[in-house]
Swiss-Prot record:
<feature type="binding site">
    <location>
        <position position="287"/>
    </location>
    <ligand>
        <name>ATP</name>
    </ligand>
</feature>
<keyword id="KW-0694">RNA-binding</keyword>
<dbReference type="GO" id="GO:0005524">
    <property type="term" value="F:ATP binding"/>
</dbReference>
<dbReference type="GO" id="GO:0005829">
    <property type="term" value="C:cytosol"/>
</dbReference>
<keyword id="KW-0676">Redox-active center</keyword>
<feature type="disulfide bond" description="Redox-active">
    <location>
        <begin position="344"/>
        <end position="456"/>
    </location>
</feature>
<comment type="function">
    <text>Catalyzes the ATP-dependent transfer of a sulfur to tRNA to produce 4-thiouridine in position 8 of tRNAs, which functions as a near-UV photosensor. Also catalyzes the transfer of sulfur to the sulfur carrier protein ThiS, forming ThiS-thiocarboxylate. This is a step in the synthesis of thiazole, in the thiamine biosynthesis pathway. The sulfur is donated as persulfide by IscS.</text>
</comment>
<dbReference type="GO" id="GO:0140741">
    <property type="term" value="F:tRNA-uracil-4 sulfurtransferase activity"/>
</dbReference>
<keyword id="KW-0067">ATP-binding</keyword>
<dbReference type="Pfam" id="PF22025">
    <property type="entry name" value="ThiI_fer"/>
</dbReference>
<feature type="active site" description="Cysteine persulfide intermediate">
    <location>
        <position position="456"/>
    </location>
</feature>
<keyword id="KW-0784">Thiamine biosynthesis</keyword>
<dbReference type="InterPro" id="IPR049961">
    <property type="entry name" value="ThiI_N"/>
</dbReference>
<feature type="binding site">
    <location>
        <position position="296"/>
    </location>
    <ligand>
        <name>ATP</name>
    </ligand>
</feature>
<dbReference type="GO" id="GO:0052837">
    <property type="term" value="P:thiazole biosynthetic process"/>
</dbReference>
<feature type="domain" description="Rhodanese">
    <location>
        <begin position="404"/>
        <end position="483"/>
    </location>
</feature>
<dbReference type="InterPro" id="IPR050102">
    <property type="entry name" value="tRNA_sulfurtransferase_ThiI"/>
</dbReference>
Amino acid sequence: MKFIIKLFPEIMIKSDSVRKRFIKILTGNIRNILDKHDDSVAVVRHWDFIEVRSKHEENRPHLIELLQCIPGIHHFLEVEERPFTDLHNIFEQTLERMRDELVDKTFCVRAKRRGKHSFSSLEIERYVGGGLNQHIETAKVKLKNPDVTVRIEVDNDKLLFIQARHEGIGGYPIGTQEDVLSLISGGFDSGVSSYMLIRRGSRVHYCFFNLGGAAHEIGVKQMVYHLWNRYGSSHKVRFIAINFEAVVGEILEKIDNGQMGVVLKRMMVRAAGKVAQRFAIEAIVTGEALGQVSSQTLTNLRLIDEAAGTLVLRPLITHDKEQIIAMAKQIGTEDIAKSMPEFCGVISKNPTVKAVRERILAEEEHFDFDILESAVQNAEYLDIRQIAEETAKGVVEIDGVSVLGENDVILDIRSPEETDENPLALENRQVIELPFYKVSSQFGELDQSKNYVLYCERGVMSKLQALYLKENGFNNVQVFVKAK
């Protein structure tokens, strides 16, 4: 099994030294991700493409899914590799492979070539196309919009048949740009803005301001883990949780109602700036869009930035909410975001849309900044790669079972892609498929006389969801543990 990885076009127009560095980093990222799932994978970089090989054909669907989510990959090709002797032999092998597929179809041949040969790419197209047209009576050549495009690549002494093309997410490889710290709330905006910086080549760390208790943090961890696991698992990243309940309490008590929203955002970016400074992170990222809510006017955003002490990036600044939700759906965070309440908006009934700097500074003089400093000092720092261990510590009241009882129903909370690829089939046992991002909204609709045993591949999401359900009063949940 072989894949040819084609690079994001912006990488190819870089200078030689920069392009080589980007390709080297992307090669390492691909290797880091695929090695976890297939120990036979070999990743080799070339001047303008990367070659991926595997000995395990059964892993093909999973490797395709992984490659589609790695930043820096524009598209990749599934190829069948064969030796060849000459141009006529290329035609013979193409005829053997494509004869049945071209019956009663229009077609064209597209060829690419690397190395020294006695023929050009155009000559391959003409010779092979003419031969196919002669030997398959019901096939017809059509150069524009044919039914079938026969794709051939000649790489020195190897003939490559293109079996399929898959699109990647593009962007730059993670690690080619500096680290950033994303202010993640679990909503639509912060999830999408985090993804956009991942795709642009930054290693994204996450800073969460907890305003809603354990259930809020569990929901945010689900989103963060999803973003990291799907798009950024080539790198170690940090999850920082800061309990902001005392800060909000101080604001409610000391700050004028109309100024609360701007002051709260200033406190958040102050705290995030301190965290960023501690880890030498160059910028913080927010999901704010111009005019979307009262605190997101240019006047207010400028005042918020003044408190940050570092660069503030807003990748969604010109996006409409409809666009943001569409992107959230595309990257798989929509349903998680739907279940996440918006805590920041509840503290101010009449927010100002044009805050005055002097008024904000005067209000902040009433604020006890020791409370903010204490919140930052007592922040929880977590390596996302160890989130499973931390989750296990937090769900000691959740039973893990490997033997099922008569009243137990397996609740498969994997994504639809995972269940399609590897369905869970247990003899004489009911299995309900309910993706993890729909559990919070749809679990209550299930038959509550049953006991539900949650299952996912690694046990991380199932533990998070079980804790979430327990927090919300559902005691008929356990976690499925595979027997060793």
